């Protein structure tokens, strides 16, 4: 029960603050607050800081990020500028947290100049633009490759299939499009305007970044950031400093003459310093807006802490009203200082301003005024002032303890400061003498002086210009008031035509989010409807019609923030001629036709994206190996680079002009294309080029081009949604009519299985004519047919299915598949996939299996109940088996791959490529035939649609693997066998669905 403030006051008044009731109440409130903080910390992201930090540095990072992240300061190793490195990791995570990264839409984030290996290790969906501007950048790339290699070797399962996502292009020249971007200390070489131009090139509207910050840079030539232990210094005329004078630096000075650089040196560290152009860093302190290519970009400085500035840049389109934008750079450390001008040249023409504590100057001038005497020589006056100045900045010893009185004055400025104070004192005495003499002057003389003041002012101006050494001195030449802030006013006036309708765009963003939610709801409703349909009894039974309720996609008023526009923040680009027909069909009043055209357009964009990814990946490897885009050569260090990439891609290789390969090419592997300075394409034996796994079958560009030229089909799509082993291939065999039909499969293995079932051979001319893969149909000339029979249709993108129907001129497609098994999945996590699900005109279900034994039925039913959301319906909750095999499943724990029971009569499946590779290696060690490990060892994804008598599922790792929690993957694994299934695993894995249901399994009698 809550205690009101009045009751609390009464308790304190009656019992006192030390009373038991008051103490208990305070303890309760304190414990509740502490528990709440601990719970919040447990929910936060765990961030492990290995750098060794002292007490003050630990407090800095905890005060900045301790409330947001669960920081673990392990104090493992000494690292260069440890606090700055630890802060950089937290800054990266903090900036990424500003953008959506989970849910239906996996938004890609760009990182301008960041460390791509950080994102690779954490699995971030981030593309890094990391140009090689010099040897330092190449050293960093090599170091990051080493870190990636080390991580993969230590934990190959975690990084299986994960590729680093970066390019070596400057940010302005990279064509990867994304809504959001970060720049963690990456803006030093680009400046504010450079970042804005990079954002415009990428279609980015929101950037969040960090940089080192010290307001004193605006008026000082050097300074110190105490939290980071970083000294900064402006270097004019490049390397003109005496301590840096050398032949090399003099040459460099000529190359960058006229530029003012700024160097950041970390205290007591011999690591390489950071040197950048001052104008780029200054732009983040002084600039406010920048208009470029139809957009106005504004910078907002968010947080300044521990010498780190966090800022954000937002781009807005269209016309902006005139506005004066004001911001300040504050210098709180200057409130106790005053500026004193001291002479630099002997003729007293050149002066400079130095900072001096206000108390020191006040006390020194006070004593100087009291001790001033006209009869003394200037040297005696000077010594008195120097003595006072020295006492105000000296070290004194009291009872054996050394104490600093004031601040020490720079040894080079010390005599000139005393000399300037002496001149200032003399000027004041002379001015007071004139005032005293004027006190007794007559009215006429005062009138004459007032009348001739303009003349005297003119004479002084002429004398000051012609004879600078004769100009009179004024008070302002000695003392300068130091402001505690600097104000910058930027008048933002842009006229770019169309006015940006903020309200309409806000509605578009809302519609965008609502459409995501509706899509999720529609998918759930569709799954429920399909599950409630009657099963298919025979081929002649009419298929149940499903009324699809769809609605037109929301359209935005402008192209900005348009939910249907994949590049948010860019003006709508003109469509190529090939897409005009499909684009026109997307606006058709026929909802079904519009859906199919939109799906085909998405499939075109998806294949184009995959093609660009292949080019980007190969270009990254080419540049990492020292290649350029002018000559056909690679620099040294090839073995290290390709050994590192070989850990994630065993097909990465180098072909030399002599015809040899760096690594032996696996038997049966033939590369379609390669990559070198000419780009991606077919290569000759006399060329130097590189390849990876994507070069074996590289047809994405051809598929996108083929689909562009087609239009959406108007034929009928029927779907038979059946459980595993319900006889889909048998139904295709019964329905097939050579005169009117063509059989389409999703992959080559399924095509071979269907050919064997229908024609008894997988490579005969007749079998290859009537059974084709979807890719083969789109890439080659095919005859027109009236009906298409599609096997494992869930592995196809809906747009690809529509393209196949369009090219074959088919009026009907009868599709077979299982909507609850592994469906089509995007190979690019950053691609916004929305229209891959098959939308049939007619749908029916089949819930009887002829393949799976009797004991598999309750296991799968139990597995569906545990994995699927509460209330979700599934075909497998009421499926039946016609198999005569009663008991088929078993399991056993094994310590390593060496004890896996390898038998040529069994079919082996794994969830991961790493486990598959380990089994293949084991089979080679046992000298088993190549036909066995080439055809009898597959991943679960590769084995979908396959039927075998004896199946063994192998898991060799107990580390986290989400595939064992996925119902579609576990369903495929448990329904491939006809006679026996054995699960062999190493160690316990939390959340393993198959192990969970097998643990409660009892044999059927």
From Swiss-Prot:
Entries under Gene3D superfamilies matching the protein: P-loop containing nucleotide triphosphate hydrolases
Residues that hold ATP according to the record: 722-729
Keyword match Hydrolase: yes
BP GO annotations: methylation; mRNA modification; RNA processing
All residue ranges annotated as the Alphavirus-like MT domain in the record: 72-285
Membrane topology: Peripheral membrane protein
Region (Methyltransferase): 51-404
Chain segments carrying region ATP-dependent helicase: 719-983
Keywords: ATP-binding, Helicase, Host endoplasmic reticulum, Host membrane, Hydrolase, Membrane, Methyltransferase, Nucleotide-binding, Transferase
Claim: Membrane is one of the keywords in the record: yes
Residue ranges annotated for the (+)RNA virus helicase ATP-binding domain, each copy included: 695-846
E.C. designation(s): 3.6.4.-, 2.1.1.-
Subcellular localization: Host endoplasmic reticulum membrane
Pfam family, one: Vmethyltransf
GO MF annotations, alphabetized: ATP binding; helicase activity; hydrolase activity, acting on acid anhydrides; mRNA methyltransferase activity; RNA binding
Ranges for domain (+)RNA virus helicase C-terminal: 847-1005
Gene Ontology CC terms: host cell endoplasmic reticulum membrane; membrane
Similarity comment: Belongs to the bromoviridae replication protein 1a family.
Record text on subunit structure and interactions: Interacts with RNA-directed RNA polymerase 2a.
Record's function text: Involved in the virus replication. Contains a helicase domain and a methyltransferase domain. The methyltransferase domain is probably involved in viral RNA capping. Involved in the formation of ER membrane spherular invaginations in which RNA replication complexes form.
Protein name (record): Replication protein 1a
């Amino acid at each position: 029960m809550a205690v009101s403030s009045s009751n609390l006051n009464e308790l304190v008044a009656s019992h006192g603050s030390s009373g038991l009731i008051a103490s208990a109440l305070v303890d309760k409130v304190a414990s509740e607050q502490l528990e709440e903080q601990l719970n919040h910390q447990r929910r936060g992201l765990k961030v492990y800081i290995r750098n060794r930090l002292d007490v003050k540095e630990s407090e800095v990072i905890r005060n900045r990020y301790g409330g947001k992240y669960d920081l673990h300061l392990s104090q493992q190793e000494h690292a260069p500028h440890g606090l700055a490195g630890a802060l950089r990791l937290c800054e990266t995570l903090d900036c990424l947290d500003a953008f959506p990264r989970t849910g239906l839409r996996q938004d890609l984030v760009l990182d301008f100049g960041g460390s791509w290996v950080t994102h690779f290790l954490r699995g971030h969906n981030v593309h890094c633009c990391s140009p090689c501007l010099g040897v330092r950048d190449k050293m960093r790339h090599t170091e990051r490759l080493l870190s990636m290699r080390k991580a993969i070797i230590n934990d190959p399962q975690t990084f299986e299939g994960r590729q680093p996502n970066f390019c070596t292009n400057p940010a302005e020249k990279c064509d990867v499009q994304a809504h959001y971007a970060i720049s963690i200390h990456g803006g030093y070489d680009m400046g504010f305007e450079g970042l804005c131009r990079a954002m415009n090139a990428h279609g980015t509207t929101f950037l969040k970044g960090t940089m080192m910050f010290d307001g004193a840079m605006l008026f000082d030539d050097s300074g110190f950031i105490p939290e980071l232990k970083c000294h900064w210094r402006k270097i004019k005329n490049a390397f003109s400093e005496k301590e840096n004078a050398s032949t090399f630096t003099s040459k460099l000075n000529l190359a960058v003459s006229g530029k003012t650089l700024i160097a950041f040196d970390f205290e007591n560290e011999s690591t390489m310093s950071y040197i950048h152009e001052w104008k780029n860093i200054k732009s983040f302190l002084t600039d406010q807006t920048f208009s470029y290519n139809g957009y106005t970009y504004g910078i907002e400085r968010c947080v300044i802490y521990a010498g780190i500035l966090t800022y954000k840049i937002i781009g807005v389109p269209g016309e902006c009203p005139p506005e004066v934008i004001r911001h300040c750079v504050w210098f709180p450390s200057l409130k106790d200082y005053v500026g004193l001008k001291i002479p630099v040249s002997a003729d007293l023409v050149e002066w400079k301003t130095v900072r001096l504590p206000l108390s020191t100057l006040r006390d020194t001038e006070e004593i100087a005024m009291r001790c001033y005497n006209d009869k003394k020589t200037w040297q005696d006056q000077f010594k008195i002032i120097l003595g006072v100045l020295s006492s105000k900045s000296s070290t004194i010893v009291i009872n054996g303890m050394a104490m600093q009185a004031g601040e020490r004055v720079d040894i080079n400025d010390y005599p000139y400061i005393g000399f300037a104070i002496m001149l200032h004192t003399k000027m004041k005495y002379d001015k007071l003498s004139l005032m005293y003499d004027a006190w007794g002057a007559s009215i006429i003389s005062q009138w004459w002086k007032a009348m001739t003041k303009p003349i005297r002012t003119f004479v002084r101006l002429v004398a000051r210009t012609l004879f600078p050494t004769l100009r009179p001195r004024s008070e302002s030449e000695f003392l300068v008031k130091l402001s505690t802030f600097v104000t910058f006013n930027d008048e933002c006036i842009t006229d770019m035509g169309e006015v940006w309708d903020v309200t309409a765009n806000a509605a578009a963003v809302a519609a965008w989010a609502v459409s995501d939610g509706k899509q999720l709801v529609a998918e759930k409703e569709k799954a429920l409807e399909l599950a409630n349909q009657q099963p298919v009894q025979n081929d002649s039974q009419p298929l149940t019609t499903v009324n699809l309720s769809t609605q037109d996609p929301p359209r935005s008023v402008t192209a900005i923030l348009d939910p249907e526009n994949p590049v948010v923040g860019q003006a709508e680009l003109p469509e190529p001629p090939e897409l005009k027909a499909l684009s026109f069909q997307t606006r058709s009043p026929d909802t079904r036709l519009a859906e199919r055209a939109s799906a085909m357009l998405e499939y075109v964009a998806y294949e184009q994206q995959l093609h660009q990814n292949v080019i980007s990946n190969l270009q990254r490897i080419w540049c990492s190996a020292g290649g350029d885009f002018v000559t056909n050569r690679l620099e040294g260090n090839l073995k290290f680079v390709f050994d590192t990439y070989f850990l994630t891609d065993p097909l990465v290789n180098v072909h030399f002009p002599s015809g040899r390969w760096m690594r032996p090419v696996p038997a049966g592997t033939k590369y379609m294309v390669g990559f070198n300075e000419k780009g991606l394409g077919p290569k000759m034996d006399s060329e130097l080029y590189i390849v990876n796994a994507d070069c074996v079958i590289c047809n994405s560009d051809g598929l996108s081009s083929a689909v562009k030229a087609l239009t959406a089909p108007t034929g009928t799509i029927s779907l038979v949604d059946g459980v595993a082993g319900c006889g889909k291939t048998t139904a295709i065999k019964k329905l097939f009519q050579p005169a009117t039909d063509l059989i389409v499969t999703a992959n080559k293995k399924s095509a071979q299985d269907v050919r064997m079932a229908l024609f008894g051979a997988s490579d005969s001319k007749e079998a290859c004519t009537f059974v084709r893969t979807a890719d083969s149909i789109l890439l080659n000339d095919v005859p027109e047919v009236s009906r298409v029979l599609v096997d494992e249709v869930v592995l196809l993108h809906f747009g690809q299915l529509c393209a196949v129907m369009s090219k074959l001129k088919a009026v009907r497609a009868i599709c077979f598949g299982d909507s609850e098994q592994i469906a089509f999945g995007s190979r690019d996590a950053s691609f916004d996939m929305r229209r891959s699900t098959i939308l049939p005109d007619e749908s029916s279900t089949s819930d009887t299996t002829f393949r799976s034994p009797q004991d598999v039925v309750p296991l799968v039913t139990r597995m569906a109940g545990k994995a699927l959301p509460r209330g979700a319906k599934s075909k497998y909750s009421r499926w039946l088996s016609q198999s005569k095999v009663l008991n088929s499943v078993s399991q056993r724990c094994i310590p390593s791959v060496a004890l896996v029971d390898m038998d040529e009569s069994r079919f082996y499946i794994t969830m991961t490529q790493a486990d598959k590779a380990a089994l293949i290696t084991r089979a080679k060690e046992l000298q088993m035939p190549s036909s066995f490990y080439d055809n009898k060892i597959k991943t679960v994804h590769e084995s979908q649609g396959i039927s075998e008598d004896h199946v063994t599922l192998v898991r060799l790792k107990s580390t986290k693997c989400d595939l064992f929690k996925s119902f579609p993957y576990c369903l495929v694994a448990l329904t491939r066998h006809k006679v026996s299934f054995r699960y062999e695993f190493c160690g316990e894995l939390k959340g393993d669905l198959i192990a969970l249901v097998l643990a409660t399994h009892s044999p059927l009698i």
